[in-house]
Amino acid sequence: ALGNYQQEKQKKSLKRKLEKEEELRLQEIDRLECELKELKEFLSKKDVYSDPVKSREVQERITEKENEIQEATARWEKAAGELEEFQNLY
């Protein structure tokens, strides 16, 4: 009986860890999307889009942010997949 208790405790601990990882990844995506929105709003300001140097810098940052979002989404998909796999096992 003690072995079963330990196993259940370990399963719950692992499940919490997987859930936390998934939640952190979602928060990361939300944060990056907010930053992207701010950059796009900044780019739409006349003094920014009318200045080729500023405009190019902001465009580069937007591209970087979009890449970060893609990477973060891949990490979230991995975390969500691991959680789903765990839930299917138990």
List each language-model region with its residue ranges.
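Charged, heptad-repeat coiled-coil alpha-helices that serve as long linker/dimerization "arms"
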Residues: 1-90
